[in-house]
């Protein structure tokens, strides 16, 4: 899957939220190192497994987006195992959707911050049980603090997109952790104070990025 290219109004290419986080946040490396070590000791090809996990997550996101907006997903480029696990994650999303009163306003929204010079793509802005939130779908085995930093940055993107008119309307955020092995989901809810922390951390990472040589 091709990476999204973000450009500002002067046609300058900008780094994405995930690139800035992954390239500058030191504490998010431990989990990946531990995961890689575990699979290497088991004789697994850790890079192959990591690539496969990314493809499964991408496919699950596509399935969710097509369900929300209508349409179908081409499965030709995916293996049977990737399709099976992505479908399991998708079924978890569908169960969450049926368990709650959900109204979607935006999905896969690609935005650029002219003020802070970065770009990002949000999974969804939706109303869940009467609360307007940012929603993010994750197929990872755990929830990590950098996800909250990511959401803090997305909130900034969204509020700039609406000229700050919607700042007070966003009530929080939800990370929906989707199981790839058996149908199910976990909801991780975050308040405005949590998003404020995430944005504070992201601005520090921006400073590091700006001062790199």
Where are these regions (language model features)?
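Metal-dependent nuclease catalytic cores that hydrolyze phosphodiester bonds in DNA/RNA
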Residues: 1-119
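Nucleic-acid nuclease catalytic cores
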Residues: 109-203, 207-213
């Amino acid at each position: 899957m091709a990476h999204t290219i973000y450009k500002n109004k002067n046609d300058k290419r900008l780094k994405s939220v995930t690139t800035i986080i992954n390239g500058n946040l030191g504490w998010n490396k431990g989990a990946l190192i531990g995961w890689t070590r575990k699979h290497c000791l088991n004789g697994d090809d850790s890079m192959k497994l990591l690539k496969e996990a990314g493809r499964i997550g991408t496919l699950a996101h596509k399935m969710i987006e097509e369900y929300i907006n209508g349409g179908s997903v081409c499965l030709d480029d995916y293996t049977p195992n990737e399709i099976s696990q992505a479908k399991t994650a998708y079924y978890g999303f569908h169960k969450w959707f049926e368990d709650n009163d959900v109204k979607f306003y935006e999905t896969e929204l690609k935005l650029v911050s002219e003020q802070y010079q970065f770009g990002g793509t949000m999974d969804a802005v939706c109303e869940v049980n009467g609360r307007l939130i940012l929603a993010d779908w994750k197929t990872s085995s755990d929830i990590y603090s950098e996800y909250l930093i990511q959401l803090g940055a997305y909130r900034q993107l969204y509020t700039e997109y609406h000229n700050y008119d919607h700042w007070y309307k966003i009530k929080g955020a939800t990370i929906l952790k989707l199981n790839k092995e058996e149908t199910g989901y976990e909801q991780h809810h975050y308040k405005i104070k949590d998003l404020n922390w995430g944005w504070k951390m992201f601005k520090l990472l921006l400073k590091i990025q700006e001062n790199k040589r």
